[in-house]
């Protein structure tokens, strides 16, 4: 899991 992927999750919510 990359930091950008986590960012995507945060933006998704």
Swiss-Prot record:
Induction comment: A fusion of the 5' UTR and initial codons of the gene with lacZ allows expression of beta-galactosidase, suggesting this protein is expressed (at protein level).
The cysteines covalently paired via disulfide bonds are none
Segments traversing the membrane: none
Biological function: May serve a regulatory role in expression of downstream gene pssA; in a pssL-pssA-lacZ fusion, mutation of the start codon of pssA to a stop codon in pssL decreases expression of beta-galactosidase, suggesting translation of the 2 genes is coupled.
Miscellaneous note, as given in the UniProt record, is:
This gene lies upstream of and overlaps pssA on the same strand in another reading frame.
Q: Any idea what this protein is called?
A: Protein PssL
Naturally occurring in which organism (per UniProt) = Escherichia coli (strain K12)
Q: Which gene encodes it?
A: pssL
